[in-house]
Amino acid sequence: VFEIAPSAK
C-alpha cells in the first residue's frame, strides 16, 4: 500500500 495504486502486487 502506497498512495493510490499498490505497486507490490
From Swiss-Prot:
Signal peptide location: none
Keywords noted in UniProt: Heme, Iron, Metal-binding
Claim: Metal-binding is one of the keywords in the record: yes
GO MF, any single term: metal ion binding
Family from the record: Belongs to the plant globin family.
Function: May not function as an oxygen storage or transport protein, but might act as an oxygen sensor or play a role in electron transfer, possibly to a bound oxygen molecule.
Protein name per its UniProtKB record: Non-symbiotic hemoglobin
